[in-house]
Amino acid sequence: MAAATGPSFWLGNETLKVPLALFALNRQRLCERLRKNPAVQAGSIVVLQGGEETQRYCTDTGVLFRQESFFHWAFGVTEPGCYGVIDVDTGKSTLFVPRLPASHATWMGKIHSKEHFKEKYAVDDVQYVDEIASVLTSQKPSVLLTLRGVNTDSGSVCREASFDGISKFEVNNTILHPEIVECRVFKTDMELEVLRYTNKISSEAHREVMKAVKVGMKEYELESLFEHYCYSRGGMRHSSYTCICGSGENSAVLHYGHAGAPNDRTIQNGDMCLFDMGGEYYCFASDITCSFPANGKFTADQKAVYEAVLRSSRAVMGAMKPGVWWPDMHRLADRIHLEELAHMGILSGSVDAMVQAHLGAVFMPHGLGHFLGIDVHDVGGYPEGVERIDEPGLRSLRTARHLQPGMVLTVEPGIYFIDHLLDEALADPARASFLNREVLQRFRGFGGVRIEEDVVVTDSGIELLTCVPRTVEEIEACMAGCDKAFTPFSGPK
């Protein structure tokens, strides 16, 4: 990213300096898109409400604040309790900040002026939240465009802006959501620089974890090391999601690390480790998974499963380019997994017939990847007209879109040996006929392997953002403490 000449977000030391021009450009993009929409009247004004501080249940213990994602995309504001207004016709932006009581200075620090926030966030005007109705009245908007829509990953409805006096205005809450979501799908050059940075720091942290892991450690010790590196070296106070540090059978638990299974197993000799962790900088995410043997040396079975997943990962990245349909990439990964599992003797028979029986979903029940940005599962996966495919595996895809330049996605194929899925397949004659029970038994308790990369779709291929050891030789060298150079995948760009 070119040196920022205007206001910027920066945490000092070697952290990334992010120009506030990034958000000014996002607001400009949104206005340009809205002006092209025939349903948008002249005199329309966008109203966004930022996130609010919360407490732990009924106590006064604060929960660390993280800005609401749409508001961050448009304004880059780190403080809670704010609103943002954008005049669609002119692009003029107004930030509304809370009017703080004098006691705030005692407990929380200096109370800043409106001019401070105007300079800090490079907006056209700053007013107080309690003035929002009167300020908007003076602007005489034809309609207020508020944000209401369903997140297609969570199924939850985003919070629509509301304030005292909003009932006096004409409000439309259907136009804005699809337009701002589509803006977020395509990253600007400045946004890509932040995502390169989150991947750089998180990749370095994964390499430190690989070097540090030892048999006898607790999984959470590696979670702690990862988060410490990201924060101390990268200024990442937040993680993009709860760290998944699965060893042994836990490596087949897709979202391990939750409160009921808090990365608390002791790592044992012979385990595979699957560590899915990503740091977040200024609300921009990363999402990286590394799989490796706990003792630093792959067994023959571990190597076979790992290299099967590596082959599918690289085949997908080599095939990605504008116009490619994402479900076809999932199917490509599935087919390669089935071919490799047959080569290992776990499966036998026609791979085409296995595909027809949806056997791939037994070993990879999740989708191949998802959009990445300000949210780790970023918005825009299923806009109007893009339907979810109701087939095993494919129904878990978080998007079924055709790839276009500027999209950022994860590529995360995996092979897992999940007992209840294997038992279901063995009880189903249509699938059991392909399974070699004796060989399969050897892999009960193996866990799983996932390889997850973050990539940008370019005009002719992809740019790989993640930079960690991936081949068996590279991983073993890294875990042995060697500083041997490794070459990340390089596909068409």
Swiss-Prot record:
Catalytic reaction(s) noted: Xaa-L-Pro dipeptide + H2O = an L-alpha-amino acid + L-proline
Ligand binding (a dipeptide): 255, 287, 377, 398
Cofactor note: Binds 2 manganese ions per subunit.
Domain of life: Eukaryota
Record keyword Manganese present: yes
N-acetylalanine modification, residue list: 2
Alphabetized SMART domains for the sequence: AMP_N
Residues that bind Mn(2+) 2: 287, 370, 412, 452
Signal peptide: none
Cofactors required: Mn(2+)
GO cellular component terms attached to this protein's record: extracellular exosome
Pfam families in the cross-refs: AMP_N, Peptidase_M24
Keyword terms of this UniProt record: Acetylation, Collagen degradation, Dipeptidase, Disease variant, Hydrolase, Manganese, Metal-binding, Metalloprotease, Phosphoprotein, Protease
Illness: Prolidase deficiency: A multisystem disorder associated with massive iminodipeptiduria and lack of or reduced prolidase activity in erythrocytes, leukocytes, or cultured fibroblasts. Clinical features include skin ulcers, developmental delay, recurrent infections, and a characteristic facies.
Role according to the record: Dipeptidase that catalyzes the hydrolysis of dipeptides with a prolyl (Xaa-Pro) or hydroxyprolyl residue in the C-terminal position. The preferred dipeptide substrate is Gly-Pro, but other Xaa-Pro dipeptides, such as Ala-Pro, Met-Pro, Phe-Pro, Val-Pro and Leu-Pro, can be cleaved. Plays an important role in collagen metabolism because the high level of iminoacids in collagen.
Protein name: Xaa-Pro dipeptidase
Organism name: Homo sapiens
Gene designation per UniProt: PEPD
